[in-house]
Amino acid sequence: MKQEFSTSWISSTQPRKQRKFIANAPLHTKHRFLSTNLSKELRQKYGKRNLPLRKGDEALIMRGTFRGKKAKVVSVDLRNSRVAIEGMQRTKKDGSKVNVFFRPFALQIQTLNLDDKQRVAALNRKQSENKEKK
């Protein structure tokens, strides 16, 4: 694999090349790596198993010390592939509070932010495709 990111590169069995692909990917491609499982209700409704996280989505934390808590996504860090969730904060030694960032695999989307018309259109398109298959 070349030094820069290449869209024509398919895959490799070597973990170092897989890590390099993810690290060198442009931000619009890294957004796809932030996919998170949907809740059972959303899965049935839209016929999709997972979607990329967005600011405004409500997520349930499935792993770690904050397990079981549900809140809105405050920010999405594409460079580090991390997500900050409302109210999930740690207190630093000086007393200031800092957001705790989560990896997307530790979350589950409970409600979607449907402000974006393109996102709604994509969901409806997938929904109609699944109905045609059945």
Regions found by a protein language model. Give the residues of each.
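Short, charged beta-turn/beta-strand-edge "cap" motif at the junction between a beta-strand
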Residues: 62-69
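Intrinsically disordered, Lys/Arg-rich N-terminal extensions and targeting peptides
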Residues: 1-53, 126-134
